């Protein structure tokens, strides 16, 4: 059934917007468009901070950046998932997981750790394994 929903994930608090866009782009068929700020279909017409493109087409799903009770900015997935072929909870969790992976990699590299991108693996349970090395 078509309706507007919002979905949050604590891992998407205090996000770096450029790193978030990079993370979304790593998910097959998905892209984040910061220039397209209106999502709509027959049932909804909402303003967002960025919209999603899925398989090259804008869909009625986007991101809003809201301030939570602690005063921190958090990315909230909002929109109408009906007919997109996407699941709101799975999508939000996948974005959060890939974002956290990229955040760990960025933090390690800033601290002069070496990460072989080819050695990053995903376990059968979905956990991402990153090996970081530091030479003395």
Predicted regions and their residues:
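Interaction-mediating elements
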Residues: 1-136
């Amino acid at each position: 059934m078509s309706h507007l929903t919002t979905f949050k994930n604590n891992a998407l608090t205090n996000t770096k917007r450029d790193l978030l866009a990079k993370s979304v782009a790593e998910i097959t068929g998905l892209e984040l468009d910061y220039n397209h700020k209106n999502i709509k279909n027959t049932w909804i017409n909402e303003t967002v901070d960025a919209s999603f493109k899925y398989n090259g087409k804008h869909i009625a799903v986007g991101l809003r950046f809201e301030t939570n009770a602690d005063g921190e900015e958090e990315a909230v997935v909002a929109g109408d998932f009906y007919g997109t072929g996407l699941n709101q909870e799975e999508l939000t969790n996948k974005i959060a997981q890939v974002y956290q992976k990229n955040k760990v990699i960025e933090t390690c590299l800033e601290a002069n750790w070496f990460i072989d991108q080819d050695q990053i693996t995903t376990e059968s349970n979905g956990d991402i394994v990153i090996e970081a090395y530091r030479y003395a």
